[in-house]
Amino acid sequence: MAAPLLLVSLTAPLAPAREGDPAAPSGPEGIFKLDHLIFIVQENRSFDHYFGTYPGADGIDFRRGKPANCIPDPILDRMSCGYHSTRDRFKGGPHNRAASITDIAGGGMTGFIRALGRGDRWCADRTSAECRDYVGPAHQPDVMSFVTRREIPNYWAYADAYVLQDRMFAPTDGWTLPAHLFLVSGWSASCRNPNNPMSCVSNVILHEPDERWAYGEDPIYAWTDITWLLHQHGVSWGYYVAPGTCSFPPCSTPGSGGHTASGKNPLPGFTTMYETGQQSRILDHDDFMRAASTGTLPSVSWVVPGKLNSEHPGSTRGIRAGMAHVTRLVNRVMKGPLWSSSAIFLTWDDWGGFYDHVKPPFVDKNGYGLRVPGLLISPYARAGTIDHQTLSFDAYLKLIEDRFLGGQRLDPATDGRPDSRPTVRETMAILGDLALEFDFEAEPQPPLILDPTP
C-alpha cells in the first residue's frame, strides 16, 4: 500500500555555514531543478471511476466483497450500486453546472443517476438497443461503473511508480471550457468589454467561444491569464493542441483550430495574447513530440487532446486510445534529453458525470468541482506515494508561479493588470503544495517506458 504524503516539514533546517566547512554543493536546489513543467489534460473521468479501487487511495468502499457505493435509481425505483466494467467505451452522464448540483445532492453525493433524466442520450432508460451495452449486471447506468488496473494498466503503473493525487478536484462545477479557462487563468468569466478586465463577471456556464468568433467577436476574454505573466518574466511556454480540438465553425477550415478559441484551447480568446503577440506559441502535438525529442521544450507546456484520444465518453474511440496517446507523450519526454529536469502532471478536466463519493470543498461560488484523477510523473517524484492534499488546477498555477515567477501570483492587486476576479485561489489556505510531492535529495528515478497498447 502506498504511503500517504504527510504535510510536514520534509527536511531539517540547514545549519549556517561555518568557516572551514566544505563548500555547499553547486547547482539548483528544490523545485529549481525543474526546468520543464508539462501539464497533460484529458477529459471527463472521476477519481472513483479510474482509481476507486487503487490500494491506499480514498476510493470506493466494499462490503463482503461488493461495492457499497449505492445511490437512488429513480428509473428502477431502487438503489443501484457501483460495478466493475471491462468496457473501453462509456456513455457517462451530463457534466454541466446543473448536473453537478444534482450529483452532489447537498453533499450526499447521491444524485448521479437522477441527473441522467430520462431517454436514451445518457442511457437513463437502459432498455433501448443503443444502451444495452452500457449497463451493469444489475442494469445500473455506466455512471456507476469503475475500471481497474486491467483496463488502464499504464495509468496505474504511473501511480505505482510516481505520485497519485486522490484529492484533485476540477476547478469548477462545469464542463470543458470553464475548466480550461481555470487551467490557464485561475478564473472563468464573461466580459462585457474585451478591452476592460474590470467588465468581467464569473460565469461557468459559458458556450463554445468559437461560435462568437464566427461573428467577429474576438478576443472575448479580457482578464489576465498566466501567459501574460510568463511573458513579463521572459519565460517560454507552449500550448499544444490536436486536430479536432475545435469542433465548431470556423474550425471546419483546415489548419484553423490551433488559433481559434475553443473549449480545450481558450488562449486565442484572451486579449492578453494580442497585447503580447504570443499567438505563435499555440502549437500542435507534432511540435511537442519534436521538441521533447530534441530537448527544445519550453519551460511550461500544456498538452490537450483531440476528440478521438480525449477519453471523452461517447467518443468513437475509448479510454485505451486516450491512454495510448498519453503514454506516447510521456515516453517521448522520458526518451529525450529533458527527462532529468521535467515534471509531468496528468489530469482530467471534469468528472464526465461519473460517480465519485467525495464532496468537493467549497472555495468560492465557482467551485471546486467534482474530484478527478491526478498524477505526477517525474524523476524526482516521491515514488509510490499517494498525495492526500486538497488540490485543483490552481495548484498548477501556483507551482508555475513559484518556480518561474518568483512567487508572483495572478493577483489583480499586484500583477500590474487589475481584473475583477473574486478570489486569488493560489493563496487559499486549503490549497496543497505540489512541491511536497518531490524528493529532490533522493536519487532521480530512471524513465519508465511503457507499451502504449499493452
Where do the PLM segments sit?
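N-terminal pro-sequences and low-complexity stem/linker regions of secreted or lumenal proteins
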Residues: 17-454
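Bacterial N-terminal signal peptides
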Residues: 2-11
